Amino acid sequence: MFNKVTKTFQYGQHSVVLETGEMARQASGAVLVSVEDTVVLATVVAAKKAKAGQDFFPLTVDYIEKTYAAGRIPGGFFKREGKPSEKETLTSRLIDRPLRPLFPEGFYNDVQVVIHTLSVNPDIDPDIPAMIGASAALAISGIPFNGPIGAARVGYVDGQYVLNPTATQLKSSKMDLVVAGTENAVLMVESEAKQLSEEIMLGGVVFGHEQMQAAINAIHDLVRDAGKPDWDWQPAPKNEALIAAVSAAAQEGLNAAYQIREKQARTTKLREVYAAVQAAMAEQAAQAGQPAPDSVGVDNILFDLEARIVRSQILNGEPRIDGRDTRTVRPISIRLGVLPRAHGSALFTRGETQALVVATLGTKQDEQIIDALMGEYRDRFMLHYNMPPFATGETGRIGVPKRREIGHGRLAKRALLPLLPAPEDFQYTIRLVSEITESNGSSSMASVCGGSLAMMDAGVPTNDHVAGVAMGLILDSGKFAVLTDILGDEDHLGDMDFKVAGTETGITALQMDIKIQGITKEIMQVALAQAREGRLHILGKMRDALEGSRTELSAFAPRMLTIKINPEKIRDVIGKGGATIRALTEETGTQIDISDDGTIVIASVDETQAKEAQRRIVELTADVEVGQIYDGSVLRLLDFGAIVQVLPGRDGLLHISEIANYRIANINDVLKVGQPVRVKVIEADDKGRLRLSIKAIGGIEQQQSGTAEPAAQSEPQAE
C-alpha cells in the first residue's frame, strides 16, 4: 500500500530522518522530517498551468504549528488554532527567502509550500527541520527548482562554532545564526549576536554552509530513490524583435530618468517613459496590422532594461541613482524628544528614508506573555514596525501588520536586544514603535538607529548606540561593486542585499539575501568591511546628537520603588482573597508586582503615591520587636484588659494591670474602642502572641497629659 523511502543522516549532535511515501501522497511532494522527537511534515503542490496574465512568481510558504505537537489544547473559547503567531510568520519568511531565487525565471505557476509541526521537543526548534523538509519536498516533486538547499543553525560557545545547538545551548551562545544555501552558494543568513566581529560572523556563515552539505547529500539520495519525473516545462521563448523595438524606444528616456536624483521626480519620469513606450508599441503593431503586444511583457522588458542601465553605470564607476559613490551614506538628520508626552522619541532621517521611533516604559505587568509551542515565556522588550502606504507616496490597505512588517520589526529588535540592561538593573518593560513616515530603502535599519536613540532619550541605560546599514552588491562578468546604504531601486536591481547592525565593538544582527550564485567568501569579506565603515559613520552622527542615555526619566514615565520583604510575609500584603493588595493599589493609584522571593516593585507616575504605598507595605510586613514602643489602636475591650493593634495585622493583649500606675476597677473608665494609645511590647511568646504595656512607659495618665515617650518609627527601605 505504501512505498515508503527513508534516509537518515547525522547532523551535528542530532540524527535526522527523512521519510516520504506514506503521508500526504496526493501532494506534488511530501517529506516527514524527524529530529529527536521534533517532527514536521513538509508538503508542496504546484499548479500545472500559470494563470492568464500572470507576471510574477506566486510562491506561498506557510509554516503552521499545532498545539497537539506539545501535548496541549489551545486556549480561548473555540479551542482551536487561530491566526498565525509571530513565530509562524517569521519561520514562513525564513523558509521562503532561500527557496524563491531557485525557481527558474519565467515560471509563474502557483506553488504552495505548507509545513506542519506535528511533534516538538522543547530543546529542538522546528525551523531547521522545516527548511530541510521544504527543500526535500520540492526536490522530489519534479517541479522546476534549482535546488535542493540545506539549512543549519550555528552557535558560538567558548570560542567554538556549534552546529545546530539546542535551545539550552543557545542560552550561553554569543551567536544564533541560521544559514541556508545550495551545494555551491550561500543564499540566506539570519543572525543575532552579542557584538561579535565581522570575521567571527563570516566564519559562522562558512561553517554552516560546509556542515549543511550532509543535509543536501541526504536529499539527493532521497530524490534518487523516491523522486518524481521532472516536469516538461520550458520558459516561453523571448520575442527578440519586441525586445529590440522596446529597447530602441525606451533607451534614451530611461537614461534621462536615471539622471534625475530625486525619487519622486524620477518615478514620475519613469512612468511617463513606460506609458510612452506602451503607446509606441501599440501604434507600431496597429500599423503592421497586428494586435498590440502584451503590456506585461513590455513592462518586463523595460524593467530588464532599467536593471542593465543602473548596473552598468555602477560597475563603470559612474554615480549611483541619487548621485553618490558606492561608499557614501546619505545625509542624516536626527531630532530627539519629538513627542512631548512620550517617554522617549527620535526622528531619524537618512536621505529619503525616515523613521519616527517612540519608546514607552511600563511595568512587569505590561510584559508580553507568549504562549509558544516550545513553552510559555514573558517578553519585556517589544519592537513594532509599521509602514503605512503614504511612506512611499501610495495608497493601500491599513490594518493588521503584514509579514514584511513583522519581519522588519523582528530584525530591528534583534539588533537592539544585546544592549538592553539586565532586568535587575532596569526593571521597566520597554516598547518601541517605529513609524516609517518616508521610505526609499533601508527602513528597518532606520528603525534600529531611531530605536537606539529613542531608548536613550527615554533614559534606558543602554551601554552604547546601535546603528544599522543596508548594503547591496552588483556582480557581473567578474566585476563587482558593493553599495553602502542602498536605495529601494538598488535593492530591487542588485544581486545581494544584506543588513548589518551593531555597535563600534561588533555586530548584533545580520540579515543577508543573495539572489545569484558565484558570490565568494572574499566578496562577502569586502562587503562586511564596507558595512562596518558605514556603520561607524552613522554611529558618529548618533553620538553627536546624544552621547549617552539621559540620567532622568520622562516626567510621564512611571516611577519604580523596590523593597524586599520576608517571603513569608507575602500573604500579609496580598490579604484574604487579594483584598489587601487590591485596596492598596486602588487607594494609592499604583501598580504593585510581588515576586516569590519577596521582591516587591511599586510603580506609579506619582512618586508621592508610590512612597505612600511603600510605607504601607513596610507597615504590613514589619516585625514587632520586644522593647519597642508603638502607636496602636484599641480593637476591642475585655473584662481583664484590651486588644490593641500595634501594626497592620499584628495585635496584642494589654492587661488591665499594665494600663495605669493605679488600680483600675472598670476598663471602660480609661479606654474606648478605636482610641489611639502608645504601648510598649514587653513580651512575645513562641507562638508570636504579644503582651503590651502602657504602664512601662509612664501609664495612661501620662499619655492623657501629653508627656508620653515617643513611639519607634519604621523607615521604609528602597533597594
Swiss-Prot record:
Signal peptide: none annotated. It catalyses: RNA(n+1) + phosphate = RNA(n) + a ribonucleoside 5'-diphosphate. GO terms for biological process: mRNA catabolic process; RNA processing. Its EC number is 2.7.7.8. It is an enzyme of class 2 (transferase). Its cofactor is Mg(2+). Mg(2+) binds at D491, D497. It is found in: Cytoplasm. GO terms for cellular component: cytosol. The keyword Metal-binding applies. GO terms for molecular function: 3'-5'-RNA exonuclease activity; magnesium ion binding; polyribonucleotide nucleotidyltransferase activity; RNA binding. Gene3D superfamilies: GHMP Kinase, N-terminal domain, K Homology domain, type 1, Nucleic acid-binding proteins. Keywords: Cytoplasm, Magnesium, Metal-binding, Nucleotidyltransferase, RNA-binding, Transferase. Residues 558-617 form the KH domain. Pfam families: KH_1, PNPase, RNase_PH, RNase_PH_C, S1. It comes from the Bacteria. Involved in mRNA degradation. Catalyzes the phosphorolysis of single-stranded polyribonucleotides processively in the 3'- to 5'-direction. Belongs to the polyribonucleotide nucleotidyltransferase family. This is Polyribonucleotide nucleotidyltransferase.
